[in-house]
Amino acid sequence: MISLDGIRKVFKAKRGSVTAVDGVNLKINEGEIFGVIGYSGAGKSTLIRMLNMLERPTEGSVIVAGKDLSKLSDRDLRIERQKIGMIFQHFNLLWSRTVRKNIAFPLEIAGVPKKEREKRVDELINLVGLEGREEAYPSQLSGGQKQRVGIARALANNPKVLLCDEATSALDPKTTDSILDLLVDINEKLGLTIVLITHEMHVIRKICHRVAVMEAGKVVEEGPVLDVFRKPKEHITKEFVKQVTEPEETVQHLLNEVKSGRIVQLTFVGESAEKPLITNLIRTFAVDVNILQGKISKTQEGSYGTLFIHLDGPKDEIEKAITYMHEQQLELEVIAGA
């Protein structure tokens, strides 16, 4: 659906130049939700703006639905841009227009007849859950409602791709989740390809199928969300994963608290996160099992979790319990107790 080949973006400055995106290659599949995560200055905003040519790449090609956008004439590019919707962190609504007229705006520009335009606006209002707020102005809306207007407006021309530029960064956690749920619903109902950028791993975990991690203009890691959570390779990726998996207290604190037995860190992925592991350990082996800390989260591809447990008892029984856990295909690390 989307292919980025050797994308590079250099901005000229008074003292030299700044490379914002440096040699990025990405393939984004049709119908998937693809996330790009990175800290401020990583180049992710520049990258997403090149997907619809709001920024033109210095080098490389941007191919969307088989067409190289970087080689199109201005007229042809305007036509192709209608197939790519975009929503923004600060909504970018027209404050003098009602909800209905904001959503209708791109249809007016496209020359859609009034009756057809009104029908499409009604469909979109229902899709994003803004029934009863059609005649309200942006100043009368909550942050979440404003973003719903932005989403509806971005979908007005039936795009094939939706770009989300930090779309939930200005929202509180509860509203963020409601907008993320809406994006998943739209993805499933419309088969829409969604590309989002964020600095929050919670957003990636909750709705993305695959993720790319950016640092200093480069993609340093990429893959299915579950794989990246399970085995992050780069230091920056590990930092992001810790946002949603790291227990509140440190491992060092656990080491100081426990004087005997073994402390084991378990990583659950997919179906293994649903198994009654602790119950089976207690029933099968002569060991005491104490849960120290843990968390299980849901991703679009299945469950993911981390768990710290303390095993105490006869040494041979502890060894049997650890062997059993290995046999359950769990990621396991003994972090204390030789």
Swiss-Prot record:
InterPro entries attached to this UniProt entry: AAA+_ATPase, ABC_transporter-like_ATP-bd, ABC_transporter-like_CS, ACT-like_dom_sf, MetN_ABC, MetN_ABC_transporter-like, NIL_domain, P-loop_NTPase
Membrane topology of the entry: Peripheral membrane protein
Subunit relationships: The complex is composed of two ATP-binding proteins (MetN), two transmembrane proteins (MetI) and a solute-binding protein (MetQ).
GO cellular component: plasma membrane
Keywords: Amino-acid transport, ATP-binding, Cell membrane, Membrane, Nucleotide-binding, Translocase, Transport
Similarity-based family: Belongs to the ABC transporter superfamily. Methionine importer (TC 3.A.1.24) family.
UniProt-annotated location(s): Cell membrane
Binding locations of ATP: 38-45
Role of this protein: Part of the ABC transporter complex MetNIQ involved in methionine import. Responsible for energy coupling to the transport system.
Organism from which the protein derives: Halalkalibacterium halodurans (strain ATCC BAA-125 / DSM 18197 / FERM 7344 / JCM 9153 / C-125) (Bacillus halodurans)
GO molecular-function terms, A-Z: ABC-type D-methionine transporter activity; ATP binding; ATP hydrolysis activity
Top-level lineage group: Bacteria
Chief localisation class: membrane
EC number in record: 7.4.2.11
Name of the molecule in the record: Methionine import ATP-binding protein MetN
Domain called ABC transporter: residue spans: 2-241
